[in-house]
UniProtKB/Swiss-Prot annotation:
Organism: Streptococcus pneumoniae serotype 4 (strain ATCC BAA-334 / TIGR4)
Keyword Chaperone annotated: no
Entries under NCBIfam families matching the protein: galT_2, PRK05270.1-1, PRK05270.1-2, PRK05270.1-5, PRK05270.2-2
Keyword Translocase on entry: no
Record's protein name: Galactose-1-phosphate uridylyltransferase 2
């Protein structure tokens, strides 16, 4: 069967198009790919594989230029043919939601995979493994899914005329957007609209997911990130409205925040993170909130966990803790709420529903810098930046490391170095490699060496989280943590 015929057959079987639409669909494909593809045969069977072959044929026919951007734009346009229009997607979602919220979520997730908005083939390239630590198993991922632009495209992106449409990659205006060299193609993108605390919000999946059913809840308006009482209201509303999903927010300050601070949004999904499994190391109750279970989590970062069947109690207590933290200083342990009227304190909040109760984890953050730590006092320090130097955002806070692609090859080089092979180790890894070699001087087994290096990456990630922790895992640090808790006001169990 010809490539075009096979692709169109798939489109008809997996959409609302009918056999009568075959000629129309064929012409839509030819208009995008080029009529020279009409007689091309294929042995492929899967829809996304057929789409990929059509894209390569378009490059061969010079219908599109040979670039990552052009490929992505055409690919999204082709997959838009199997994607219902936004109003239909929303109608279907809410009609199903009325009798089964779980099924509505599952159907939207399946659509977002089927139409290649979620890049399953790319995500499958990621390296993922777990390592033991003093805080339970941590999750390590080396992110290989996002395609890197070639140098010509990077230059082209710098030369392109500035545009503020869409204003950012999280705006509703991305739905159906054609794409350009410095903004991703979104022809096949769909967003579920819903009302939350009196405002319109959107629900979508992340194209390059870091974990199972990784999704984004985004403000319908382009407003900056802000941690406030409303954040807690919204996060708890999300876990109530989207069963089985957690919801969390990046902090709203530089250094301790995520990569996008210009558009308010939360992340969620169906995944149990290491932090969720971490137990309380100290339990207590806050005065005036006796019905809320509370405690400090055994975790490298500084986490207060609140549990209750009352959303209102959780919101009120979380807001009280946030307000106290924003103005709290303890110079004895290098904690300052502000310097020169610049605020340093905020919270990374995570909400979930567990055993019928609502749970909030509040991670205390401080974005101070100093002469000794110019990148951040509570940020990965210089000696671990060869593994992770970027901000510690929501996902890392919860115990899942997102490490750069360079580490795939570099980890293998260090393993080769440990078994005595003549390899060049990156300068920034040399001290680490020498340290591992001194600990394992007689290694000859490459697989064993690789396992040692990967475990060491995990141990370094635990150190990264400890660096980001405001209260250290020492007697002094934990005593200071309790001073803050007492400032909020507690009743000891």
């Amino acid at each position: 069967m010809t490539l075009v015929n096979k692709f169109v057959t798939h489109v008809i079987s997996e959409s609302s198009f009918e056999e009568m639409d075959r000629i129309y669909l064929t012409n839509r494909v030819l208009a995008r790919v080029g009529e020279g593809v009409l007689e091309v045969e294929t042995n492929l069977d899967k829809l996304i594989d057929l789409k990929d072959q059509l894209v390569e044929e378009a490059v061969r026919l010079e219908t599109i230029e040979d670039s990552q951007t052009a490929r992505e734009i055409l690919g999204a346009e082709l997959m838009d043919l199997v994607t219902p229009c936004p109003s239909q997607v929303n109608r279907d979602f809410w009609a199903t939601y009325a009798h089964s919220p779980e099924q509505a979520i599952e159907d939207f997730y399946q659509l977002s995979q089927k139409n290649d908005y979620i890049k399953l083939k790319a995500i499958a390239r990621n390296i993922a493994y777990r390592v033991p630590s003093d805080y339970g198993e941590l999750e390590i991922t080396i992110n290989l899914s996002k395609p890197e632009k070639d140098p010509k495209e990077i230059v082209a992106a710098k030369l392109v005329q500035a545009s503020n449409y869409p204003q950012c990659q999280l705006c509703l205006e991305n739905e159906g957007y054609h794409g350009r060299v410095n903004h991703p193609a979104r022809s096949n993108h769909r967003i579920i609209r819903f009302e939350m605390v009196g405002q319109e919000w959107g629900f979508q999946y992340s194209p390059y997911a870091y974990f199972n059913e990784h999704c984004i809840f985004l403000d319908g308006q382009h407003r900056p990130m802000a941690i406030s009482r409303q954040s807690f209201e919204r996060l708890l509303a999300i876990v109530d409205q989207f069963p089985g999903y957690f919801a969390g927010s990046n902090a709203d300050l530089p250094i301790v925040g995520g990569s996008i601070l210009t558009h308010d949004h939360y992340q969620g999904g169906r995944h149990v993170f290491p932090m969720e499994l971490a137990p309380l190391q100290k339990a207590f109750r806050f005065a005036g909130f006796e019905q809320v279970k509370a405690g400090i989590v055994k975790w490298p970062m500084s986490v207060l966990r609140l549990t209750s069947d009352s959303k209102e109690d959780l919101i009120n207590l979380a807001d009280k803790i946030l307000q106290e933290w924003r103005q709290y200083s303890d110079p004895a342990v290098q904690i300052l709420a502000e310097t020169d009227r610049t605020p340093h304190h905020t919270i990374t909040p995570i909400a979930r529903k567990r055993d019928g109760q609502f749970e909030l984890d509040l991670v205390l953050r401080d974005n101070q810098t100093s002469a000794e730590y110019p990148d951040g006092i509570y940020h990965p320090h210089k000696d671990v930046q060869h593994i992770k130097k970027e901000n510690i955002g929501l996902i890392e806070v919860m115990g899942l490391a997102i490490l750069p692609p360079r580490l795939k090859e570099e980890v293998e080089q260090v393993a080769s170095y440990l078994v005595g092979e003549a390899v060049t180790v990156a300068d920034y890894h040399q001290e680490w490699a020498d340290q591992l070699k001194s600990q394992h001087p007689d290694l000859t087994d490459k697989e064993k060496a690789l396992a040692i290096v990967k475990d060491s990456v995990g141990a370094i990630f635990a150190r990264v989280l400890e660096d980001a922790g405001v209260y250290k895992q020492t007697e002094q640090g934990q005593t200071a943590f309790m001073r803050f808790v007492e400032q909020v006001g507690i009743l000891l169990d």
